[in-house]
UniProtKB/Swiss-Prot annotation:
Keyword Cell membrane: no
SUPFAM superfamilies found in the cross-reference section: LigT-like
InterPro entries named in the record: 2H_phosphoesterase_YjcG-like, Cyclic_Pdiesterase, YjcG
Motif (HXTX 1): 34-37
Record keywords: Hydrolase
Organism: Geobacillus kaustophilus (strain HTA426)
EC number, UniProt record: 3.1.-.-
Name of the protein this chain belongs to: Putative phosphoesterase GK0864
Short motif HXTX 2, span: 115-118
Keyword Ribosomal protein in annotation: no
One Pfam family from the record: 2_5_RNA_ligase2
Length: 173
């Protein structure tokens, strides 16, 4: 089965992202706005139980996670993805590192650029038009989150929560 590890930002950031995603993101119906900590990976039930135990340990040692969204940006020319830039910070960086070492070993597929995707699969001309407008907008959110999530992918391609991990030593939901 395919799994991934993400942070869901607070509701007001999700609502802001969704106001764009519903028009520009082909994955809008498959997963809520999120910050990817570990890209999708395959694991069996035994592996995922061990990983969930390790994620509980990591969560217990992780402080609340600051989320600061500062602007629209893009991965162009690598891809036509438009996103909300989440400023890197020590907590996010450390969490990302922990999710790519030990039991989770494996070099990350991409350099860690914390972000919330709001547009993908846009044809070149539409991408250029949309991004040229969005990059001029003023964006500023500062929030703190207290959890991250292990997700699994359903047969229809959508993602659902397998387990939620509360940071700072609280019990899991």
């Amino acid at each position: 089965m395919k799994y991934g590890i993400v942070i869901f930002p607070p509701k007001r950031i999700q609502d802001f992202a969704n106001s764009y995603r519903k028009r520009y993101d082909s994955h809008y119906a498959l997963i809520p706005p999120h910050i990817t900590l570990k890209y999708p990976f395959e694991a069996d039930e035994e592996q995922i139980k061990k990983m969930a135990k390790e994620l509980r340990r990591i969560a217990a040692e992780t402080p609340p996670i600051p989320i600061k969204v500062t602007k629209f940006s893009s991965f162009y020319p690598t891809s036509n993805i438009i996103y909300l830039k989440v400023e890197p910070n020590d907590v996010l960086e450390r969490l990302h590192e922990q999710l790519h070492s030990g039991l989770f070993a494996g070099k990350p597929e991409f350099v860690f650029v914390p972000h919330i995707t709001i547009g993908r699969d846009l044809p070149g001309a539409e991408y250029a038009d949309v991004y040229s407008q969005l990059k001029l907008q003023d964006v500023h959110f500062e929030e703190t989150v207290d959890r991250f999530h292990l997700l699994y992918q359903l047969e229809n391609g959508s993602w659902t929560v397998y387990e939620t991990f509360i940071v700072g030593g609280k019990e899991t939901v």
